[in-house]
Regions:
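Polytopic transmembrane helical bundles with strong interfacial aromatic enrichment
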Residues: 2-480
Length: 480
């Protein structure tokens, strides 16, 4: 039974990870793309430069598909909550339901209404009014993110609640405290700025492939899009790194075990604390060896000063046992997965640095006065390949957030093992995992195929096709 129970928990966790990671491919992408398309259309409304109108229409197609796929994957994610985590839903429903209800009734309503108007009214409003529609859509996507992150931030740092001893459930006592949760206002800027960066990298990467095609009449469009995407990539990669630093300060305060794991620290560091570039982690014996360190750098990163030591996981584990043993027992394992967090952090920050470097070099090569980017095919290929890397960085950041909360599903209140549905079985979880994986593969394939087809047809395909359309009731429609 113990093995069966562990298998059920592992399979349920895998399904949650799979559905959330895949959903998170599209959420930052659609948020960022909507924002950048709004900027494009605003530039057109102000400058009347038609290339920005063409850009808004072309990249708007990519935004619409990512938005649609994000909705589908979000529905699947909510469905598996009820199927696999009913005890969690029962425990957290009073708190979790409020932000989700507001997200659906307010934010998603705004998105749905204005995205529909924006899609079908290109020639019915003045440019400024039409740009307002996509701005409202973009604001709606960001409002959705706030409410979802409010629920997740409660799971990381619970506020504004009490435990009903009769039912054993959380009850919401202060909605304002949930909204004002310091975790929320540290994680939200980091996520949103990373979303803008993601869209910028994708625009730059797809534009690079467009330039490599050398299709007549498209050079100006794709070069303008390329520089737009590169500027967005550079600016928002820098801003996202700064927001991530602020989030780190909150993690040190609320979840020291998570921070220690991201830095691979088992024993308390000396003062000042060195930053470990790479190391060999022995999670079984709770030790690390083969370290390559930069003296004093971790103190600067953690405390913004050249002094201060950092607690190790072994010390923090003892403190958590002293705090929670009376409630959860002495057999609890408070160590988070150190290898996952250590390398996820380095992948995330490494990719962010790579994007800054590539965007900076790309901007140099694509300067207006020196038309050299087309002659450096290697640079265009690098940019084209890099369009995938922000999705890896976003997933790595999600791994840090979720794996770093282990063994809690609601920090300090409810464990992952207690949250699984009592009716879940290995068979049903295996079946649903396979079905979801196949469905996600199909959705991902459709998204990639559509983006490729859109790029292949180019920005002026729709206009050329529209000229051939006729009134379905005109005589031309009947071949006369």
């Amino acid at each position: 039974m113990l093995t069966m129970g562990l298998s059920i928990v592992s399979l349920a966790r895998f399904q949650f990870a799979m559905t959330t990671v895949f959903h998170f491919f599209f959420v930052p992408f659609s948020i960022g793309m909507g924002f950048l398309v709004a900027i494009m259309e605003t530039i057109y409304a102000v400058k009347k430069d038609k290339v920005y109108l063409d850009m808004a229409k072309f990249w708007g197609k990519i935004f619409l598909l990512s938005f649609a796929v994000g909705i589908v994957t979000g529905i699947i994610q909510e469905f598996q909550f009820g199927m696999n985590w009913s005890e969690y839903s029962r425990f957290m429903g009073d708190v979790f339901g409020a932000p989700l209800a507001i997200e659906a009734l307010l934010a998603f309503f705004i998105e749905s209404v204005f995205i529909g108007i924006w899609m079908f009214t290109w020639d019915r409003f003045k440019p400024g009014v039409h740009a307002f529609m996509i701005w409202m859509t973009s604001i709606g996507t960001m409002l959705s993110a706030i409410w979802i992150l409010a629920a997740n931030s409660f799971m990381q740092h619970p506020t504004g609640f009490r435990i009903n001893n009769a039912t054993g459930r959380i009850q919401l006592t202060d909605f304002g405290a949930v909204v004002a949760n310091p975790q929320l206002w540290k994680v939200f800027p980091h996520v949103i700025l990373a979303a803008f960066m993601t869209a910028g990298v994708v625009i730059a990467g797809m534009s690079a492939w467009g330039l490599l095609r050398k299709k007549s009449g498209e050079n100006h469009f794709f070069k303008t899009s390329l520089r737009f995407g590169l500027w967005a990539s550079l600016i928002f990669a820098l801003a996202s790194a700064g927001a991530g630093d602020l989030q780190t300060q909150q993690i040190i305060k609320d979840q020291p075990m998570k921070f220690a794991a991201t830095e691979g620290i088992y024993e308390d560091t000396k003062d000042p604390a060195p930053w470990t570039v790479v190391e060999l982690i022995d999670s079984k014996n709770h030790t690390a060896s083969g370290k390559i360190e930069l003296p004093g750098v971790l103190s600067l990163l953690a405390y913004h000063k050249l002094s201060g030591s950092v607690k190790g996981m072994n010390t923090i584990n003892k403190e958590l046992h002293a705090k929670y043993d009376k409630k959860f027992g002495k057999d609890m394992n408070y160590y988070v997965p150190p290898k996952t967090l250590f390398w996820s952090f380095r992948v995330m920050t490494g990719i962010d640095a790579l994007i800054m470097l590539v965007a900076f070099v790309g901007l140099i090569f694509s300067r207006k006065k020196k038309d050299t980017i087309e002659s450096h095919k290697w640079m265009l290929v690098v940019l084209g390949i890099c369009l995938w890397v922000p999705f890896i960085a976003n997933s790595a950041g999600w791994f840090i957030t979720e794996f770093g909360r282990y063994p809690w599903i609601v920090y300090g209140l409810f464990t992952i093992a207690d949250a699984v549905s009592p009716t879940s079985t290995v068979g049903t979880l295996l079946f649903s995992n396979i079905v979801y994986f196949l469905l996600f593969t199909l959705l991902g394939g459709v998204m990639i195929w559509y983006c490729r087809q859109t790029l292949h047809h180019g920005p002026y395909f729709e206009e050329a096709d529209a000229k051939q359309n006729v009134d379905p009731f005109a005589k031309e429609a009947f071949g006369q």
